[in-house]
Amino acid sequence: VYKRQGEVLAENLQGALPAITLEGHPALFTAYMNDCDPLLCFAQQVNGLGKQGDVLFGISTSGTSKNVLYAAVTAKSKGMKVVGLTGAKDSKLSALADTCIQVPETETYMVQELHLPVYHCLCLMLEEKFFG
């Protein structure tokens, strides 16, 4: 019935992994923050969406961002793995994470600049691993 569309899809769709950004839902943020503790917004999403075997990728320049830490604790309680991306200092997130990539800077703007190539590299590595 949809032969042509099927051919277009088969020729053009790329492989994908299920991934959800916890900060990409403005309506949810607004509604949740009006009625609940704003620091728990990420944790609430992990609680609703996460399941054992999933991975939470938590980014915090200091490793002490409460909203990220609450999400990480929630993830661990659900049997999820936690990967952290932080600055150089040991932190609550680096201690809680199963794996933590710590870039060798402590100033926020420098940590953020060093995070860019790290997560681009991680994306490339995942693409290679899963889609060759």
Predicted feature locations:
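Short, small-residue-biased leader/transition segments that mark boundaries at the very start
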Residues: V1-Y2
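Beta-rich strand-turn-strand
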Residues: S62-K66
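Short, glycine/polar-rich helix-capping loops at beta-to-alpha or helix-loop-helix junctions
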Residues: L85-A97
